[in-house]
Amino acid sequence: ESSAASDVYKRQGQKIIQDNGYIKADEKAPAYKSNGAKGKVVVGGSSSVTPVMEKLKEAYAKANKDVTVEVQQSDSTTGVTNAIEGTCDIGMASRDLADSEAKKGVKATVIAKDGIAVIVNKDSKVDELTSAQVKDIYTGKTTKWADIK
């Protein structure tokens, strides 16, 4: 695991994550101390992770003057693929790894969690949905509101 990737777990990184509207992944993260790293780190992938990664990049740069962090925004699949192929050092994804991706030797590390809201029309008789019901709607298993019980 790269130093830059593990540093996101440090107390300062988790505070940045929380300050940007995400849920911290590690409530007990230790304080970060620079290890004197030098060079360039390329981070690429998910557009939904990019804003918080830019904030983490700023904080990391302050603590590590000899490191350049380049953040490339695309999508989760591109981020994972580029990490597998070595085009980037850290891939950003806003989803779990597919089994086929995990088999290629990359490791997923959750740095934050975000909330997703499902909004229903005000005239709908449905006023509450379970996660299973939302899944069934989006996978096509449930196609009629009348089937929601």
Could you say what each language-model-derived stretch is?
Residues 1-5, 9:
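Single conserved hydrophobic/aromatic residue that forms the stacking wall/gate
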